[in-house]
Amino acid sequence: MNKKNDINRKIFCNFFKKYEEGLTYIPYPGLLGHKIYNEISKLAWNKWILQQTIIINEKKMNMLNKNDQKKIENYMIKFLFKNKQQL
């Protein structure tokens, strides 16, 4: 990945269904992280981060707990991809 080309790159954001500024880094490990990098805009990712904080606090999740980690990952997939796409 060339950092110089990552700045201000435009992608078609699957969250907003339009071209938006892409992320400058892969925000999550594995194939899911690459999918987010390629298909989710910086603005959509920031919306998820805010939503994630709300979910963790309301459901009193512990991010050191593997079950809670998997739950928040599932919430993230549903939020970002509207549960319409297979990973």
Curated annotation (Swiss-Prot):
Monomer. Keywords: Iron. Signal peptide: none annotated. One of its GO terms (cellular component) is cytosol. Transmembrane segments: none annotated. Could be a mediator in iron transactions between iron acquisition and iron-requiring processes, such as synthesis and/or repair of Fe-S clusters in biosynthetic enzymes. Belongs to the Fe(2+)-trafficking protein family. This is Probable Fe(2+)-trafficking protein. GO terms for molecular function: iron ion binding. InterPro entries: Fe_traffick_prot_YggX, Fe_traffick_prot_YggX_sf. Pfam families: Iron_traffic. PANTHER family: FE(2+)-TRAFFICKING PROTEIN-RELATED (PTHR36965:SF1). GO terms for biological process: cellular response to oxidative stress. The keyword Chloroplast does not apply. The keyword Hydrolase does not apply.
